[in-house]
Structure formats: C-alpha cells, structure tokens
C-alpha cells in the first residue's frame, strides 16, 4: 500500500512538472527545448563573462606566444575577447577534465570551446522552443524558420569553419576587435568579397534594412487619424483593436506613384512575407558561402585577367583587392609563418650558379 502511494505521488509530481513545462499560461514559456536551453545559455553566459574579465593569455597559434584577451590583462571593451583555443589542440574536444590542470586548460583556451559549444546548443534549442510555442498556440511555424538564418550564420563561423580549417583556433574570437580581425583574415585567405553568396548576403542585410525603413515610414505616414494635434499618435491605437490602424490603400497609392504601380504591394500578407523572407534568404546564402569557404572553395579570382598586346598586366579592381589580401595575410600570425600560404605553396625557383 505504501509503495503504491509513493508511486502515485511521484507520478503526480512528474505530471505537474510536465504540465508546468508545456503550459502556455506561464509568464515565460519554458517548453521541453527550454529545459536544455536554459542551463546551456546560462553556462555559456557565465563562462563568457568570467573569461572576458579574468582569463589569462591563450597560446592561440600553438607556438608558445600567448595572446591576452581579458580585461584584467590590459584590454578594454573594444579590444577584449575570449581568445579561441590553441592550434596545438586543433579540433580535439577539450573539456576541463582533458587537461592536466586548470592552468593548462586556460593556457590552451579551453573556455572558448566551453562557451561556443554551450552557446550553439543554446541557440539550437531556442529555435526549437520557438517552434514548440508556435505549435502549442496553433500558430504557423515560420518564426523558427526565420531565426534559422542567424543560427546558420553562427554555426558557420563557430563550428563549420574551424572544422574545415582543421582547428578551433581559426574560429571567430568572442569580442569586438576579434570579430573584425576574423573578417579581415577571412578576406585575406578566402576572398569573401568576391564570393557571390556573400554578395547575396549583403543584398539581404542592406535590402532588409531598406525595406524595413520604407515599410515603417510608409505605415507611419498613412496612419488613420484618431487623435488631436496635441496628443501622441500612438494613443490612436488600442491593443487588440479590429480596425486597421493605417490606410494600406493610401500607402499603396503613394508608393505606386513614387516608383510605378507594380513596385508597390497591394496585399499585406505577401508584403510581410517578403519583408521576412528577403533578409533570411540572404543570410542563409552567406552562411552557406562561409561553410563552403571553410573547405577552401573560395571567392572568384580574376587576378591579372586583362593583359595588353605585349603581355603586360593591366590592373583591374580584382588585382587591387588581391594586393590588399596578400598584405593582410602577411601581417596576421606573423610569427607563425614567414610568408602568405599562397606564396609558400609555390616552389622556389632553381638558381644556377
């Protein structure tokens, strides 16, 4: 009898927990994905803050020349970063228990792996949680599809690119100037500016900003008057009201006359689908481009494409970019190798004495 009661009580506790996790009445929805999301994002955040403030220098290139990234070792908010794990570690999984000591783990950049792995699991489960809440509320599932674009971009720079390059030391540093350094080195080694997928991403981000500004300004300029001149226009809208708060016909007529008729949407649903899809597709392409460049399928190379009748090169913009790439490649990791990899790969000319 006692055993039966205990089983029933434990079952009740589990059922209460399940109903609480999946309840849409909570102020913040937890969900089954949230059960994994919350601890992983908390772990990543706490470790990131501690490492950004106090982590000792990391031997990022694996040549016994540690690079300081934390505030306590002389950096500021702009220059500080969680430095990627050492090239000596490569792609090895490097949790704390794999190191001989905590000092060794810190020296080899262990916190970087801890942060990015927990962060990636956290954003994957956040995306799953978006789907889960949409499902519970009977909504369509496109919110998590839109969120998949930044998730794909983060996965590309933190996971796919290091795998393709053979070391987590090539991952993006977790800091402001570290991000810029990553971008410059990426351009030097992969010519990303000449990759069509990156061009699509630029069109997605800049175009999305333009369309967002256009839509916001058109709506704001065609609001239905509900207030006096002395009141804020925002008081003219009541949350949940059934009536349209702006005149889409007026906005359509304005923009159709400003450009031409068919450049203006006359359907609010197709308009908002377009506003969501444009930047998402662009960022998907950029993530795809970074993931292919990870395995050295690089941007277009039009260097020295034009020559005159005497065989002399007529420089184009591609040649200017190439010279800049070589200069950037020479300067980064300057103690790890003496020449850019492009130059080092060429056989030395034979000298006949």
From Swiss-Prot:
Chain positions recorded as a quinone binding sites: 215, 264-265
UniProt modification remark: Tyr-161 forms a radical intermediate that is referred to as redox-active TyrZ, YZ or Y-Z.
CDD domains (alphabetical): Photosystem-II_D1 (cd09289)
Site (Tyrosine radical intermediate): 161
Binding residues annotated for chlorophyll a PD1, in chain numbering: 198
CC terms in the record's Gene Ontology section: photosystem II; plasma membrane-derived thylakoid membrane
Membrane topology summary: Multi-pass membrane protein
Subunit structure: PSII is composed of 1 copy each of membrane proteins PsbA, PsbB, PsbC, PsbD, PsbE, PsbF, PsbH, PsbI, PsbJ, PsbK, PsbL, PsbM, PsbT, PsbX, PsbY, PsbZ, Psb30/Ycf12, peripheral proteins PsbO, CyanoQ (PsbQ), PsbU, PsbV and a large number of cofactors. It forms dimeric complexes.
Protein name (record): Photosystem II protein D1 1
């Amino acid at each position: 009898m006692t055993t039966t009661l205990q089983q029933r009580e434990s079952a009740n506790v589990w059922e209460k927990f399940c109903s609480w996790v999946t309840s849409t009445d909570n102020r913040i929805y937890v969900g089954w994905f949230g059960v994994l999301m919350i601890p992983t994002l908390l772990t990543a955040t706490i470790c990131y803050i501690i490492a950004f403030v106090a982590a000792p220098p990391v031997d990022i290139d694996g040549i016994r020349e540690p690079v300081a990234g934390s505030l306590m070792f002389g950096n500021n908010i702009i220059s500080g970063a969680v430095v990627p794990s050492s090239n000596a570690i490569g792609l090895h999984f490097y949790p704390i228990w794999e190191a001989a000591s905590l000092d060794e783990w810190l020296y080899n950049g262990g916190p970087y792996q801890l942060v990015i792995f927990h962060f990636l699991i956290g954003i994957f489960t956040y995306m799953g949680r978006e789907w889960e809440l949409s499902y519970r509320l009977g909504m369509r599932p496109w919110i998590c599809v839109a969120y998949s674009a930044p998730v794909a971009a983060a996965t590309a720079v933190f996971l796919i690119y290091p795998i393709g390059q053979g070391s987590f030391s090539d991952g993006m540093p977790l800091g402001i100037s570290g991000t810029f350094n990553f971008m410059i080195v990426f351009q030097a080694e992969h010519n990303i500016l000449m990759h069509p997928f990156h061009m699509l991403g630029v069109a997605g981000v800049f175009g999305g900003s333009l369309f967002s500004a256009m839509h916001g300004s058109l709506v704001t300029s065609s609001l239905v008057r509900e207030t006096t001149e002395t009141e804020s226009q925002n008081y003219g809208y009541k949350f949940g009201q059934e009536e349209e708060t702006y005149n889409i016909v007026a906005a359509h007529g304005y923009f159709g006359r400003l450009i031409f008729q068919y450049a203006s949407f006359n359907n609010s649903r197709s308009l908002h689908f377009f506003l969501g899809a444009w930047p998402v597709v662009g960022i998907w392409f950029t993530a795809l481009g970074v993931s292919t460049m990870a395995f050295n399928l690089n941007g277009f190379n039009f260097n020295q494409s034009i020559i005159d009748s005497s065989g002399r090169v007529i420089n184009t913009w591609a040649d200017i970019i190439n010279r800049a790439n070589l200069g950037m490649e020479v300067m980064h990791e300057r103690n790890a190798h003496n020449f850019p990899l492009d130059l080092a790969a060429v056989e030395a000319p034979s000298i006949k004495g």
